[in-house]
């Protein structure tokens, strides 16, 4: 039985990530099995026929939670009065395409979307950004939507967290459920910081199970950092199904939190407990509070290895920010 209904917008509605994500969303994986969904699916003009096909499949899925499905090429209609937006649509990264090549094109897209959110979305709407370069795109959208709460903008780092989680599980030969406190800091890029020093295996420090520090620093970390490029090289396209799953999990950690769960998210750095510059979107370890708000987990120690990686990632975010104009 539906106890409430949320209004949700998904951009890039005809793309690969959205195609996987929409069915997870409709099933209740994000907001729960008792929450109805008023769904608006947006894509750019010229995609109307493909959008209609997506709607047909959602109708054919007979999802009880879908109260309404609207497909549109109008950002105003998509964002009008929404409680949450999943900004998936962007120019994709292909083989040989670097992040800097995406900044200008996608910056314009997210500036436009931020302005539309500012005009039409609810002030407390939560905004989840997926399109790369995701930290900077999220920052652009946030700064073009000053009416909305800055703390409610999230850049997706959950895919990086999941990649690290899986690698640690395989190396330790334990179930995924035995690995906790998996943390990714900084930028969603090849300069992200997969912080194994915080991780626990069976509630014990990771070093008790994986004692090979060289493997952690020189195999695991660069493998997680470069996994997106490896997927593109192998299949000729960027991650889609795994990204959609990570997006659903990222939002579920906020809307349906597990007690004590840590999750990595790119959030506004204003007033952060680590003394990092303000007005950035930076990946932090977070957890939900009883108030329904998240907090950046404070007072986590950084050893020399992690501190050095943190500075590299911070420098990249600052460089990206400096390269775009609002």
Swiss-Prot record:
GO MF annotation, one: L-malate dehydrogenase (NAD+) activity
Keywords: NAD, Oxidoreductase, Tricarboxylic acid cycle
Residue sites binding NAD(+) per the record: 12-18, 106, 113, 130-132
Pfam families referenced in this protein's UniProt entry, alphabetically: Ldh_1_C, Ldh_1_N
GO aspect biological process, one term: malate metabolic process
Catalytic activity: (S)-malate + NAD(+) = oxaloacetate + NADH + H(+)
Active site residues according to the UniProt entry: 188 (proton acceptor)
Binding residue positions for substrate: 93, 99, 132, 163
EC assignment: 1.1.1.37
PANTHER family in UniProt: MALATE DEHYDROGENASE
Its job: Catalyzes the reversible oxidation of malate to oxaloacetate.
NCBIfam families recorded: MalateDH-SF1 (TIGR01759), PRK05442.1 (NF003916)
Family designation: Belongs to the LDH/MDH superfamily. MDH type 2 family.
Name assigned to this protein: Malate dehydrogenase
Phylogenetic lineage: Bacteria, Pseudomonadati, Chlamydiota, Chlamydiia, Chlamydiales
């Amino acid at each position: 039985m539906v106890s409430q209904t949320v209004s949700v917008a998904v951009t890039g509605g005809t793309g690969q990530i959205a195609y996987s994500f929409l069915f997870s969303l409709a099933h209740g994986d994000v907001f729960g099995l008792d929450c109805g969904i008023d769904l608006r699916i947006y894509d750019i003009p010229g995609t109307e026929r493909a959008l209609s096909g997506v709607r047909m499949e959602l109708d054919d899925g007979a999802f009880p939670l879908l109260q309404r499905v609207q497909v549109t090429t109008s950002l105003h209609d998509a964002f009008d009065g929404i409680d949450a937006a999943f900004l998936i649509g962007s120019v994709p990264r292909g083989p040989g395409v670097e992040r800097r090549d995406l900044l200008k094109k996608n910056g314009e897209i997210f500036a436009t979307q931020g302005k539309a959110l500012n005009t039409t979305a609810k002030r407390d709407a939560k905004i989840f950004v997926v399109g790369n370069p995701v930290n900077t795109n999220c920052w652009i959208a946030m700064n073009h939507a000053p009416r909305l709460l800055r703390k409610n903008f999230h850049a997706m780092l959950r895919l990086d967290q999941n990649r690290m989680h899986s690698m640690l599980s395989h190396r330790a030969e334990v179930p995924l459920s035995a690995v906790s406190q998996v943390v990714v800091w900084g930028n969603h890029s090849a300069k992200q910081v997969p912080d194994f020093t915080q991780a626990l295996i069976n509630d014990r420090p990771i070093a008790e199970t994986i004692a090979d520090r060289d493997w952690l620093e020189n195999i695991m970390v660069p493998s997680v950092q470069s996994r997106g490029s490896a997927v593109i090289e192998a299949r000729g396209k960027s991650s889609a199904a795994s990204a959609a799953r990570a997006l659903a999990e990222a939002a579920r950690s906020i809307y349906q939190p597990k007690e004590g769960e840590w999750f990595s998210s790119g959030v506004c750095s204003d007033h952060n407990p680590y003394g990092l510059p303000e007005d950035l979107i930076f990946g932090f370890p977070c957890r939900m509070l009883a108030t329904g708000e998240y907090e950046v987990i404070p007072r986590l120690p950084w050893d020399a290895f992690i501190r050095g990686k943190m500075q590299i990632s911070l420098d990249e975010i600052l460089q990206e920010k400096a390269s775009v104009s609002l």
